[in-house]
UniProtKB/Swiss-Prot annotation:
It comes from the Bacteria. It comes from Campylobacter jejuni subsp. jejuni serotype O:2 (strain ATCC 700819 / NCTC 11168). InterPro entries: UCP007248 (IPR016511). This is Uncharacterized protein Cj1463. To H.pylori HP0245/JHP0230.
Length: 113
């Protein structure tokens, strides 16, 4: 009688241990998947920041060329060039992300993976 009781208890304990092991294994795989999701979202965020930065750089180059005045009424000095460069840099950062080039580049790079 006591042997049967011991065997029943042993089989119940081993079943509980098996369930606990499966639960731990499932839990660790979920954590791994969560880490992958977090990593992918961090990578997506970094990619979006870089595509916005590239669009800002591209717009700055366009603004530098388009707003360069060759025949000015007054002579240009270093302060005018610095101001123009800072103005174009600020405008390019403000315009980046709104032209659609950043989104196009982001989607392309995301698709290529």
């Amino acid at each position: 009688m006591k042997v049967d009781n011991f065997l029943n208890t042993y089989s119940m304990n081993s079943a509980l241990l098996d369930r606990a092991a499966k639960a731990r294994s499932l839990e660790s795989s979920i954590k791994i998947n969560d880490n992958d999701i977090v990593t992918k979202s961090k990578e997506d965020k970094a990619l979006k920041e870089q595509t916005n930065a590239f669009e800002a750089f591209f717009l700055k180059q366009v603004l530098d060329v388009s707003l360069k005045s060759q025949n000015s009424l007054f002579g240009k000095d270093a302060s005018d060039e610095i101001y123009s460069s800072m103005y174009n840099d600020t405008m390019s950062k403000a315009l980046s992300g709104g032209m659609g080039f950043s989104k196009l580049l982001y989607d392309f790079l995301k698709e290529r993976g």
